[in-house]
Amino acid sequence: MTVSPDRKPVVVTDLDEAFAAVRRTGLRLTAARRLVLEALLAARTPISAEDIADGLGGRMTQSDIASVYRNLETLGELGLVRHFHAGHGPGRYVLEGFGDREYLACESCGLLESVEPAALETVRDAVRDLSGFEAGFSHFPIVGLCARCAQKRRG
């Protein structure tokens, strides 16, 4: 997904706001776009395009997965949807406003755990102090082992 680094997130809290935000851009609010927005709002947590297609319960055919991806990309370019990768799994998508958290991804079991952005401030500060680099975790979560998998590995 190509998203301008200076794009402004468009935070929405309900379907009416999401639909209005799409219309303000001059884009049509197609049936597929509506279904994708409805699925994202219902989830309120990061989900994959496949999860969206599966959750539509036959309202879109499996061959329409490409349509789900196209709509997610368009909604991302508009600033309505945040996209990131969690470990080795598929990309995950969340509506802006529900994605204003940072994520930790378990590379063993796939657990995706959200944390407040402030929880990673120490990490950001350490990276900046060490290299001058301003770290962000909006596209890639911190990958490691969840407490359960780490305990299993320790034995």
Can you say where each PLM-predicted feature lies in the sequence?
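Pre-recognition alpha-helix immediately N-terminal to the DNA-recognition helix
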Residues: 34-39
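Short capping segments at the starts of secondary-structure elements
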Residues: 42-48
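Short, intrinsically disordered or compositionally biased N-terminal tails of bacterial proteins
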Residues: 1-13
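Basic amphipathic alpha-helical segments that dock to polyanions
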Residues: 68-78
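Non-DNA-binding regulatory cores of transcription-related proteins
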Residues: 77-155
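Short, Lys/Arg-enriched N-terminal segment that forms or immediately precedes the first helix
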Residues: 13-26
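A short acidic, leucine-rich amphipathic alpha-helix
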Residues: 51-57
